[in-house]
Each structure stands twice: as structure tokens, then as C-alpha cells.
Amino acid sequence: MASCVGSRTLSKDDVNYRMHFRMINEQQVEDITIDFFYRPHTITLLSFTIISLMYFAFTRDDSVPEDNIWRGILSVIFFFLIISVLAFPNGPFTRPHPALWRMVFGLSVLYFLFLVFLLFLNFEQVKSLMYWLDPNLRYATREADIMEYAVNCHVITWERIVSHFDIFAFGHFWGWAMKALLIRSYGLCWTISITWELTELFFMHLLPNFAECWWDQVILDILLCNGGGIWLGMVVCRFLEMRTYHWASFKDIHTTTGKIKRAVLQFTPASWTYVRWFDPKSSFQRVAGIYLFMIIWQLTELNTFFLKHIFVFQASHPLSWGRILFIGCITAPTVRQYYAYLTDTQCKRVGTQCWVFGVIGFLEAIVCIKFGQDLFSKTQILYVMLWLLCVAFTTFLCLYGMVWYAEHYGHREKTYSECEDGTYSPEISWHHGKGSKGSEDSPPKHSSNHESHSSRRRNRHSKSKVTNGVGKK
């Protein structure tokens, strides 16, 4: 009797909710080819952990205090990553292996805890920590103190334009190519690119290196570097969307060359999802969600410049580019999870990686404000309000343009995940949300046995276009 009272049969909504959230937070591997790499090894890891800790505890020389602290920190990070592999969720991706994305999530949690720790230090303690990491930072200077910006903008020569194509210009180009691969929307990418240039104008009174000549900002940044990167990233997206994804097992490949090729392809997406951030039937909640996405994206970019300005290190320092690479790694699953939450009517909560990324963005901003009070005391509130209004206006224009384009040129057949109801059924659920952003949805099966040959061929070319629940959310 007690068991009957304590148990509860899951409703259809509960099944839908758990299934859709699991697909973005705990994606399962559908095409296991070598069982050894996906079988649990908890006892092996436990034995390795105990033996290695015993070895380091009783054999290493502990006479150097600084060396003890440094190696202790590295050991804590290493074993925390082991716990991450054992306990943390896969996230939306499983290529090349779920353990990699568990460690990425573990590193993001460590970075979040580190930012919390920084909030309880004073500025001198933070600087001492930086000097301990790199003694050369004692002699670092701000770029704004040794360089001039937006000087002689009326002098436009070919030599001067070419001189601006440095390593940072190529960094902008490849950075925007990667952003396009993550966002997969010309409209949003161009809106973020233009909005960022407006952000530089509104925060120029705080960061002098935001000052640029008009031709540098419009031609070199927006059109060439950002625009070229967006174009390249979207070309790759379109190529991956048109591919047919069918993965053969290692056991079915009998040649050495074939096995090597399959091993290399393990580092490529298992499938590719067609992404549509906005459509004519979207509600105001979707508009507000995309606006929040734009604000957090701009905030994360701003943190990059405020951190190196307040704590004084160059853009070429590992603290700068290392953070950029790290943020890029955790952005990939974050965007995928946020897109699913925003567009899937059955997904009622954000993924854990998305949650941690949001906290990191705001914590970085809080750290900047806490330790840069002298800088932020010069803030013009009017500029900040105008910046928020400009972001809202450009976001509205972007979404209006996307709706207009969808109404006039964007007609296409709906996939299962774009049906009105979005409810769970044994046949539809296999299609409904397996799509992941550059990740792990398996090719969908055909829905009808009496379709024509041309329809089957069209479906084969759109196998990877299953999106995760674009509904009326």
C-alpha cells in the first residue's frame, strides 16, 4: 500500500520535459563503435587516484614552499577534472568524446569558483596573485598609456590600411568564423557585429583603445574582418547542412586507411542542425530571450577589455588569449542549450553549462566593477542607457528582417521538431530534438512509405536539418 502511495506515474508532459532537457544536458552517444572508450571505468579511476596521490605525497621534495603551492593547485585541478568525468553531465555534445565536454564543464565550474574567491580579496592581493603567476606582470603597462588611437583619421593611404592587418585582424576574422559556426544566422551575426561597434563608441569614454577611425571601424572591422569571418563560417554551415550523415563502425571497416580516416572524422560533428532563431509565429518571450542573448554576448566581450585594462596586462599575454579560448570552448554548448531553451516549447529550463556561463559573465562584470571603481566612477549613465536602447533597437530590426525574409524567401517543409504540438510519441520523439548545435543528432528516418522518389532524395539532403523544437515559445 505504501509503495502505491509513494509512486507516481509520469504524465506525458513530464516525459516530454525530461526527454527534451536530457537532450541538451545529458546527450547520449548513439553510434558507439568501440565499447572500451564508452564503458564506465570508475574502479580504474579510483585506483589510479589513490596510487598517484600516495606517490606524490611520499616521494616528491616538499622543501620549496612556492613549488608546493603550485603543484598542489595543479593537482586539485587535475583530480577535479577526474570527478568531472565521473559525475558531470555530457552537455549537448558527444564528439569527439563526452568526457571532453564534461571536463570543459568542470573547468567552467572551477573558473566560476575562482571568480567567487576573487570577490573576497582586495586589489593588492589580486595583484600579488598575478605577480606570483607571472613576475613580469610587475612591469606591464596599459596599451592605452603607450599608444594613440583615432589619430589623423583624415589621412587614408594604402600603406596605412595595410599596416592595420596584424595578428589581431586575423584573430577577428577567425573569431567571427567560429561565432558564425555557433550562431548560424546571418542576421544575428551581423547584428552582433554592428552592435559591438556601437558598444565601442558608447564605452569609449572609459576605454581609450575603443577609439578608432571611421574607415578602420567600418571597412576593416565590420566589412572585411567581421564580414569575411561571418561569410566563411556560414559557408561551412551550409556545407555541413547539406551533407548526409551515416557513420560506419570501426568493426565494419577492414582497411587501415579507412580506420585512420574514421578516427580523424571522430573530431567532426556527428550531424548538423538547421537553426532558426526566429520565425513569424514567435512570441514576445522569444524576442526578449534574443535581446538577453545579445546583452550577455556584448557583456562577455566587454569583460575581455575591462579585465586587461583594470588588472593591467597586454592583449598578447596568456591571461588574455587563454581566457578568450576558454570562453570560446564553453560558449559552444552554452549557445546550443540556450537555443533549445528559447525555441523548444517542451524545454522548461536552461542547461547547466548555460547557467554557469551566465553566472561567469555577470561575475566577471562584478569583479571589474569592484576593482575598477576609479574607472567606473567616470561612467556616463546616459551613454549606458543609450547603449541599451541601441542594442534593443538593432535587435528589433534584426528580428523584423528575419521575419520578413522568412515570409518571403524562407518557406520550407516543417520537420518533426517544428510541429505545433511538440508532444512526445515513440515515432516522433526519435526525431524531435536530437539535433544539436554542431553535434550529435542521428539522421532522421523517413516518415512515410508512399512518398515519391524526389521527396525521398530531398529528405536525404536534409537529414541533418532536424532542429530542436522550434515552436511558438
Swiss-Prot record:
Residues 455-464 have a biased composition (Basic residues). Potently inhibited by choline in the mitochondria-associated membrane (MAM). Very little inhibition by choline in the endoplasmic reticulum (ER) per se. GO terms for biological process: phosphatidylserine biosynthetic process. The chain crosses the membrane at residues 36-56, 73-93, 103-123, 187-207, 217-237, 287-307, 320-342, 356-376, 384-404. Residues 428-473 are annotated as: Disordered. The modification Phosphoserine is found at S417, S425, S442, S454. GO terms for molecular function: L-serine-phosphatidylcholine phosphatidyltransferase activity; L-serine-phosphatidylethanolamine phosphatidyltransferase activity. It catalyses: a 1,2-diacyl-sn-glycero-3-phosphoethanolamine + L-serine = a 1,2-diacyl-sn-glycero-3-phospho-L-serine + ethanolamine; a 1,2-diacyl-sn-glycero-3-phosphocholine + L-serine = a 1,2-diacyl-sn-glycero-3-phospho-L-serine + choline. Its EC number is 2.7.8.29. Its main location: endoplasmic reticulum. Residues 2-35, 94-102, 208-216, 308-319, 377-383 are cytoplasmic. Disulfide bonds: none annotated. It is found in: Endoplasmic reticulum membrane. Signal peptide: none annotated. GO terms for cellular component: endoplasmic reticulum membrane; membrane. The modification N-acetylalanine is found at A2. Residues 437-454 have a biased composition (Basic and acidic residues). Disruption phenotype: Null mice are viable, fertile and have a normal life span. Toal serine exchange is reduced up to 85%, but apart from in liver, the phosphatatidylserine content was unaltered. Elimination of either Pss1 or Pss2, but not both, is compatible with mouse viability. Mice can tolerate as little as 10% serine-exchange activity and are viable with small amounts of phosphatidylserine and phosphatidylethanolamine content. to phosphatidylethanolamine. Belongs to the phosphatidyl serine synthase family. This is Phosphatidylserine synthase 1. It comes from Mus musculus. The lineage of its organism: Eukaryota, Metazoa, Chordata, Craniata, Vertebrata.
